[in-house]
């Protein structure tokens, strides 16, 4: 597989956008008297006007006032451990391409980076533990060792367990949900992989050209496909 570093990609996008990025969290969708979305209120208390509002706030989307609850109730946080390891100089390159495998029913991926580090992931769990679960770390190292034994000689320099936004069928929810209001959420484990197509659909909706997309694709990601309108 080809691969991209999500952190470097996001950093590059922010750098490209420059001062067009407002460093605050959205707290409320603003509507006019006709109930058309006209902007957002940030956590900093300031209001930001927009011709069309696109919400892509991940698992925190439900915390934004003004989104139909029938939509936000469908999102659930799915946590999972990811390890980042540094390969010793003597073992480089430990792997030269992305490895995906299934070990005793558990999916595992090993992604090499150009700087000699490796991303190892990812577990999936739906519980209340916010931090890194020891069982998840053990599972990842055990399964990765079956695929690449040298993984145990690497240095663990970071462990994370972030919440990913899952929909009922684990497929994104992208579409217009009100006049001037579009959501793009529920990307689950594949946010970076589906970012290009998700942003394309969102942009087409804003520009009024969504009909140029495959109807089956639009139906597959329709936020109201669960009968929740």
Regions found by a protein language model. Give the residues of each.
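Hydrophobic/aromatic beta-strand patches that form the interior of the parallel beta-sheet core
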Residues: 22, 54, 182-184
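Beta-strand residues in well-ordered beta-sheet regions across diverse protein folds
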Residues: 41, 121, 184-185
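Mid-domain beta-loop-alpha active-site segment that forms a flexible
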Residues: 1-16, 58-60, 136-143, 187, ...
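C-terminal catalytic lobe of FAD-dependent flavoproteins
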Residues: 150-229
């Amino acid at each position: 597989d080809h691969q991209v570093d999500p952190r470097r990609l996001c950093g590059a996008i922010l750098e490209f956008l420059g001062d067009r990025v407002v460093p605050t969290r959205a707290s409320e969708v603003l509507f006019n008297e006709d109930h058309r979305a006209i902007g957002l209120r940030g956590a900093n208390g300031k209001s930001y006007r927009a011709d069309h509002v696109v919400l892509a706030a991940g698992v925190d989307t439900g915390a934004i006032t003004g989104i139909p609850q029938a939509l936000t109730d469908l999102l659930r946080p799915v946590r999972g451990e990811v390890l980042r390891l540094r390969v010793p100089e003597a073992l480089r390159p430990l792997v030269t391409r992305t490895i995906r495998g299934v070990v005793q029913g558990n999916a595992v991926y090993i992604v090499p980076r150009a700087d000699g580090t490796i991303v190892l992931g990812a577990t999936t769990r739906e519980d209340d533990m916010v931090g890194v679960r020891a069982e998840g770390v053990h599972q990842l190292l055990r399964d990765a060792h079956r695929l690449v034994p040298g993984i145990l000689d690497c240095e663990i320099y970071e462990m994370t367990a972030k919440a990913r936004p899952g929909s009922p069928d684990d497929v994104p929810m992208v579409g217009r949900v009100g006049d001037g209001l579009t959501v793009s959420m529920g990307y689950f484990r594949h946010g970076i992989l589906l970012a290009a197509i998700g942003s394309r659909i969102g942009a087409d909706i804003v520009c009024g050209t969504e009909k140029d997309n495959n109807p089956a694709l639009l139906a597959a990601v329709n936020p109201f496909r669960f009968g929740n309108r």
